[in-house]
């Protein structure tokens, strides 16, 4: 939530300055976002690395699930140190008209994560099965590769790259503008985040069947909602670029068209969510009771989408 709000502020404000072709200010915004994301990343790393059991108790009281969660978080915590930095780089690629490179980095990371999950969780190529710890290790390696690729891409001509000396320079006016963009998004994200965290916590305390069904439903929801996230990200950048360039009329036109497109996509995603339960149940192993929970969750999530 905190990282999403910070990178959203970077996208909104940065897109406008890219429209103006004000690279100096864009460098300052990039450094500011890196500082904020770095602080947030360290805080979450400390919480997950040193207090994983207390975090898991928020979501479940099942000893088995807590043990799995603790094993996962102690390794995955290191990936949280990198996530904020890599996401800032990827957002900078998007707003500076290098969305293809950003997509390439993200796609490589996702494919690598899937392959490593299969290898580490189940065991392959001489590597023993690591179960939950394998999933965490796969995530960590994928995040390392993602950040390395993002940094390497940033040194190509026409890309915005981090200037280390600017990390320690604070622009008060720019900080205020950044918080004006990020603050409302953070507030909205916190409200939604608290809601979904509470929801997950309730599911976890209902037992393993409910927790398993909720885990599957959350993954499917996130996959289907990727389209919505992509449209909203593109809308903010496209409109921001035009506003920064002074093309107010074109920016308004883009905004209206993308708003209409989002409504159509919302309907499509709702239908997909509503009809996908039988297909998902065919591919995952759940108890009969967990299957019932999953179908009910899909109905609720379809209405939410």
What are these regions (language model features)?
Residues 1-45, 83-102, 200, 213-277:
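Small-residue-rich hydrophobic transmembrane alpha-helices
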Residues 4-7, 11, 76-95, 102-113, ...:
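Short runs within selected transmembrane alpha-helices of multi-pass transporters and secretion channels
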Residues 37, 76, 102, 106, ...:
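Residue-level signature of transmembrane alpha-helical cores of multipass secondary-active transporters
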Residues 43-74, 268-295:
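Short membrane-interface helical motifs at transmembrane helix boundaries
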Residues 56-63, 119-130, 190-223, 241-242, ...:
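Helix-terminus/linker motif at the lipid-water interface of multi-pass membrane proteins
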Residues 63-89, 220, 288-305:
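Alpha-helical transmembrane segments of multi-pass membrane proteins
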Residues 111-148, 277, 292:
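Membrane-interface helix-loop junctions in multi-pass transport and translocation proteins
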Residues 132, 136-139, 148-192:
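Interhelical loop/hinge segments that connect adjacent transmembrane helices in multipass membrane
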């Amino acid at each position: 939530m905190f990282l999403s709000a910070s990178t959203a502020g970077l996208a909104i404000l940065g897109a406008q300055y890219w429209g103006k072709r004000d690279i100096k200010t864009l460098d300052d915004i990039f450094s500011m976002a890196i500082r904020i994301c770095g602080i947030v990343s360290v805080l979450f790393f400390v919480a997950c690395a040193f207090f994983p059991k207390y975090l898991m108790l928020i979501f479940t009281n099942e000893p088995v699930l807590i043990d799995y969660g603790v094993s996962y978080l102690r390794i995955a915590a290191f990936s949280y140190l990198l996530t904020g930095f890599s996401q800032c780089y990827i957002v900078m690629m998007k707003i500076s008209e290098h969305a293809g490179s950003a997509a390439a980095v993200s796609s490589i990371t996702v494919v690598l994560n899937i392959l490593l999950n299969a290898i580490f969780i189940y065991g392959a190529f001489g590597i023993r099965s690591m179960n939950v710890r394998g999933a965490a290790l796969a995530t960590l390696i994928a995040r390392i590769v993602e950040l390395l690729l993002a940094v390497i891409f940033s040194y190509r001509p026409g890309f915005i790259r981090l200037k280390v000396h600017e990390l320690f320079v604070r622009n008060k006016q720019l900080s205020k503008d950044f918080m004006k963009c990020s603050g409302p998004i953070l507030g909205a994200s916190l409200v939604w985040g608290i809601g979904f965290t509470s929801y997950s916590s309730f599911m976890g305390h209902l037992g393993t069947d409910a927790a398993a069904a909720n885990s599957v439903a959350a993954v499917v929801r996130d996959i289907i909602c990727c389209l919505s996230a992509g449209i909203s990200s593109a809308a903010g950048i496209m409109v921001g670029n035009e506003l920064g360039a002074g093309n107010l009329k074109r920016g308004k036109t883009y905004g209206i068209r993308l708003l209409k497109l989002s409504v159509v996509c919302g309907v499509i995603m709702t239908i997909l969510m509503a009809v996908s339960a039988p297909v998902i149940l065919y591919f995952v192993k759940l108890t009969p009771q967990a299957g019932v929970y999953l179908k009910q969750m899909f109905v609720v999530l379809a209405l939410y989408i």
